[in-house]
């Protein structure tokens, strides 16, 4: 029997579950097809949320064991209980996934547990998790299948010794030596977790810099900070092969520019070279769609070339970020419901949850220079911010880039304490086409780290008062 819906959402990650919830809110009959045992996709289950749980716990452990507590007059002798750390992480994740289930019930979203495949216009077949099969039809179908870790030729992931990001969240022991392949967001965050817990961490990167999408000055500052924390970086390095055994892994390395091969030993290796869209096996050909060479699906305003098929999140162009997927989900469903909806792709913030944190939105200096666009720069260091100084967290800065003529804010780049919670103000400013002067004239509470943003805006015009 064919079950009919207004909307079928394939995938229940941040894009998929938010699309399903918004459809329910708008009174549409909606089904969400997800084969995992829990909702939330990579982000909630094996990505954003568990990694943040370990980042937070490891930061506290490092503060207690590394002298930061003692400096404040708090004397403790911490002992690492890795099993409990992993348990609390899993409990937090379970609570979040149950929360999504509650929201599905609240908004009358039907969760069909299984794996979906398109079967022609308006039709979806589902291989149910319990072994059965279901046939669904809908006027509109939303593909929100997300992404998976990208493989590295010659380095086979087994999640025993050679790990992907999921495996790195489930280790039962602290590595003696963890080698991270890839100096991007995932590699640096997970590498910093295990460094704080006692591992020697070596980061290998093919390029001559870390975080290639990040503003150059910010990236260099982050690398210096992580180096001081004990992480080792080998840039311009190519991994050509890996051999794993019971006791560890042997890697063959070469200079990216060419040269002799050398070996590097580790007891664990994390492959974190990026992610690729999960679009294989979806039956795209049955509706006349094909992914590009990167596996991504083209769209105009989330609408694909196939009638009634929409695409959101990591399967589309742009940064693979949960909040970008959520934004696209809202726009997509509003349009399906016949409402006007737009998304500003120029104002999608990104955050690296290392210590110090990194946050940015908009254009960087390299991008502005490549476009030959004239701009002004305002900087303010956290070493001159009273709250950061009092908290002994004075590393980093905030940088604002504004148009040389109009003063419109073009980009904001932050590295320092708590900047993940501050970048939202910059996003609001840019959404309203604010000028640097607008930020400079806005009263900020004292003493807070957010004052550094105002001072950076003042510095665009050479008027910073506290530096």
From Swiss-Prot:
GO CC terms in record: cytoplasm
Positions with a binding annotation for NAD(+): 182-186, 205, 239, 272-275
Enzyme class: oxidoreductase
Catalytic activity: N(6)-[(R)-dihydrolipoyl]-L-lysyl-[protein] + NAD(+) = N(6)-[(R)-lipoyl]-L-lysyl-[protein] + NADH + H(+)
Paired cysteines (S-S): 43-48
Gene Ontology biological process terms, A to Z: 2-oxoglutarate metabolic process; pyruvate metabolic process
Known cofactor(s): FAD
Intracellular or extracellular location(s): Cytoplasm
Sites where the protein binds FAD: 34-43, 52, 116, 314, 322
Record carries keyword Disulfide bond: yes
Cofactor note: Binds 1 FAD per subunit.
Enzyme Commission identifier(s): 1.8.1.4
NCBIfam families cross-referenced by the UniProt entry: lipoamide_DH (TIGR01350)
The family this protein is said to belong to: Belongs to the class-I pyridine nucleotide-disulfide oxidoreductase family.
Protein name: Dihydrolipoyl dehydrogenase 3
Designated gene of the protein: lpd3
